[in-house]
Amino acid sequence: MRKRTIGILLGMAVLAFASGRVSTAIDSVYAAEESDTSDDEEDEDEEETGDEMKLTSIQSITDFMTCAGRTLPDNIRLWARRNLAVARSHEVSPEERRHAQRALSIMMNIQWKSNYFEAIDPVEARKILDEELYGMEKVKQRIMETIIQINRTHTLPAYGLLLVGPAGTGKSQIAYAVARILKLPWTTLDMSSINDPEQLTGSSRIYANAKPGIIMEAFSMAGESNLVFIINELDKAASGKGNGNPADVLLTLLDNLGFTDNYMECMVPTVGVYPIATANNKADISAPILSRFAVIDIPDYTSEEKKIIFSRFALPKVLKRIGLHQGECVVTEDGLDAIVEQFKHTSGIRDLEQAAEHLAANALYQIEVDHVPSVTFDAENVKKLFV
């Protein structure tokens, strides 16, 4: 049965190679094999603990290398052969074999894609920005310029984006919108929670509890080498409390020259990684890191902008989510002024979004408990609610 499967894999690999879907095709064959070979003996080293569509056993990884190893980057192909030898060897400890198999499983389930990017429809890109962001015309213009550059070169820009502004001004929302435009998977990294560079680079396999770092896990979660890496609170990157500065690790990721994880013991290509960082204070970011980004300053919203965002975006969004019609929760003009006045000393719109939640919840309570058909919030009612 194994020989028949190898033959199928070889045929599928040849057919799928032209379309760049080798690993997907092979994974599908393995899934089919598992479903119709109940009378076959299982591999002794089979340890399927996650998604059955992934290559996790030594035999499945060996078959993949036989059929489609040539589709891998050269250094990763050589690395895989070395680790396969370790995983199959009886001259090393069981711990070493386990680490080798785990590393192979992570690496083999990443699709190593070309760094050629198809043209992006500017009209569709602008539509997404308008859907996700209110105002911010200068910010949208900078993003559109980046999109046009990608369309001309078919590669990612040499510099990532750094969004600098007060908390709650929609920096993360902008980052997600860009990932959506690029049609790439995205992952987030919160630098305020990173105290030790090892959290990013992984730990050496000499330790029994060794594991890959957050960056390598991000590739694994995305399932491909092209992704948007959203780095939140970049200005906290230099405040490491452990053995070194986490900011130094970021430099290797931002240079697009490849990243080496201590656990994986292999340099992975990063030319398809597009970093988008957010920060509150640009002054707290080191010059070397700052030089790797195109900086976009995000201004705070004016009172008029906050009123529009609350009435057209924040409140309707909450009402829809909890099942209320707009006519059931009405905010008068002076009520809207009172809401904005209540939060005039806070930056961004996060507090306004929470105010919309509070308002809608109160309206729903009155409708369900007091059996009123609708609730209107004027300035007086707003002040009572938020005092």
What are these regions (language model features)?
Residues 6-23:
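Hydrophobic alpha-helical topogenic segments used for membrane insertion/localization
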Residues 69-78, 114-115, 223, 281-291, ...:
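Conserved C-terminal "switch" segment of AAA+ ATPases
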Residues 81-94, 101-113, 120-164:
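Pre-Walker A (pre-P-loop) alpha-helix and adjacent loop at the N terminus of AAA/AAA+ ATPase modules
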Residues 157-191, 220:
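Walker A/P-loop
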Residues 163-165, 202, 233:
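The Walker A (P-loop) glycine that initiates the GxxxxGKT/S ATP-binding motif of P-loop NTPases
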Residues 181-210, 218, 305:
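AAA+/P-loop NTPase substrate/partner-engagement loops
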Residues 222-230, 261-279, 327-331, 376-380:
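AAA+/SF3 P-loop NTPase mechanochemical coupling elements
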Residues 231-269:
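Conserved catalytic/switch belt of AAA+ P-loop NTPases
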